[in-house]
Each structure stands twice: as structure tokens, then as C-alpha cells.
């Protein structure tokens, strides 16, 4: 990979940081509005980092599940966070009722092929009636991982060419991009049939959010918000 291409990636992530912070903050505010966590709500965060919970003032009890060496365990926070190493597609040590809400932000597209994604979804539904699963939209002009415009619309040979060039300089990063499997709205609905599907907009469709509101952390019945999108 040329120095220019390497710098392009570094610059992309640097420029995206404030934008990502803005979008995640808005997304978490929507999460609070819809899911209504209270002080001490028990949340299972699949594949997440503690930094996203900095947007939430309410002290929560959070379990973050990640592959070994991924979680930022030294992050200082006002939440009660436990870090667990594990596979989000197979969590035999957890059972229904252990958590009030299952949460995941931009993870399901990284777990593997459609079969692995279905396993992920089954674990979500097995563990709670209340969940919030977000994944990027194919239609957003700038792909969130590679920084390439309209990445998912390139012919496969073109994506393969770019990946082969990138892998010479950044093999780990390239593997992450190469193994990302974008999810369409209809597929997300198939995986999580009881969910409401929310489209997050930033001029273009930015991401999809599948959420279900079954029982509140206090145990009372709640009805889901009738929201199709926010801008």
C-alpha cells in the first residue's frame, strides 16, 4: 500500500471521530427514550466498549462481552461494568432473566456469515425480551469501516483488489473490513422477527436499529414507541 493510501485511512478515522461521537450520542439518547433504563438496570453489551456508556448519566450495571484483548477494561466510568471474554454467538453461562436489556452497537455485522448472524440474534432473543441491536446501513454513501464511497456496490473483483492492496500494509484492519457482512433491513427482520425496525438518518439512511420492548426493568408491561426514523 502506498503512503498516500495509508494516510487516507488515518485521516478518514481522524475526521470521522467527531461525527461518530455526535451520531452515537444521538443514538444513545434515543435508546434511553425508548428502552427507559433506570438506576441499576442490568444491561448485557455484546461486543461493546465502555466508552459508549459515557453518554448515559444514569448509573447502570453493565456486562460487556468481548473476544480476548478487545475490551478497554481500564476505562474510568460511573457505571458498574463487568468484563467477560466470550463469543456473542454462544453464551451458555447466561440465561433468560440475567439481564434487563441486551444491547449491541455495530457488532452483528462482524460476527461472520449469515449463519453466525442468526446465532447472534438467537442468543439476543434467548436472553431477554428487551433488546436494542444496531448495524450500519448499506445505503449510507461512506462505508463506516473502509471509508470508501458506496463500498457495497462495487463488483466483488474490485473489492478484492482493494483488500489485497490494503492487506500488504494493514493486515489486521483489512481482515476486519473483509469479514464485515452488511445486513439488509429484510434480513434483520428475519433474524429478529419480534423487533421493531428503526432507520437512523443522517441525510441518508445511516443505520438500522432492531429493538424490542417486552417488560420494563421493573417488570411492568410497556408498549413500543411508534418511531420509524429520526433525523
What are these regions (language model features)?
Residues 218-231:
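Flexible, glycine-/basic-rich loop-and-beta segments that form/coincide
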Residues 35, 41-140:
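Conserved SAM-binding loop
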Residues 15-21, 171-179:
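Active-site rim elements
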Residues 130-160:
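Conserved class I S-adenosyl-L-methionine
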Residues 174-196:
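Short alpha-helix
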Residues 1-36:
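Class I SAM-dependent methyltransferase Rossmann-like catalytic core
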Residues 194-205:
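Conserved S-adenosyl-L-methionine
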Residues 149, 162-175:
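Short, glycine-/aromatic-enriched active-site segment of Class I SAM-dependent methyltransferases
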Amino acid at each position: 500500500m502506498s503512503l498516500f493510501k495509508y494516510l487516507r485511512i488515518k485521516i478518514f478515522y481522524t475526521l470521522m471521530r467527531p461525527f461518530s461521537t455526535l451520531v452515537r450520542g444521538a443514538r444513545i439518547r434515543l435508546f434511553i427514550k425508548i428502552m427507559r433504563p433506570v438506576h441499576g438496570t442490568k444491561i448485557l453489551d455484546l461486543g461493546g466498549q465502555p466508552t459508549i456508556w459515557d453518554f448515559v448519566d444514569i448509573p447502570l450495571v453493565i456486562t460487556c462481552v468481548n473476544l480476548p484483548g478487545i475490551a478497554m477494561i481500564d476505562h474510568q466510568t460511573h457505571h458498574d461494568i463487568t468484563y467477560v471474554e466470550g463469543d456473542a454467538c454462544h453464551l451458555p453461562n447466561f440465561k433468560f432473566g440475567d439481564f434487563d436489556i441486551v444491547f449491541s452497537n455495530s457488532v452483528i455485522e462482524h460476527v461472520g456469515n449469515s449463519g453466525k448472524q442468526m446465532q447472534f440474534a438467537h442468543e439476543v432473543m434467548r436472553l431477554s425480551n428487551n433488546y436494542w441491536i444496531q448495524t450500519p446501513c448499506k445505503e449510507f454513501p461512506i462505508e463506516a469501516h473502509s471509508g470508501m464511497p458506496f463500498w457495497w456496490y462495487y463488483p466483488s473483483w474490485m473489492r478484492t483488489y482493494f483488500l489485497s492492496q490494503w492487506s500488504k500494509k494493514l493486515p489486521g484492519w483489512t481482515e476486519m473490513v473483509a469479514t464485515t457482512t452488511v445486513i439488509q433491513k429484510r434480513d434483520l427482520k428475519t433474524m429478529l422477527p419480534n423487533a421493531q425496525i428503526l432507520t437512523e438518518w443522517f441525510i441518508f439512511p445511516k443505520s438500522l436499529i432492531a429493538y424490542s420492548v417486552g417488560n420494563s426493568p421493573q417488570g411492568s408491561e410497556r408498549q413500543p414507541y411508534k418511531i420509524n426514523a429520526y433525523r
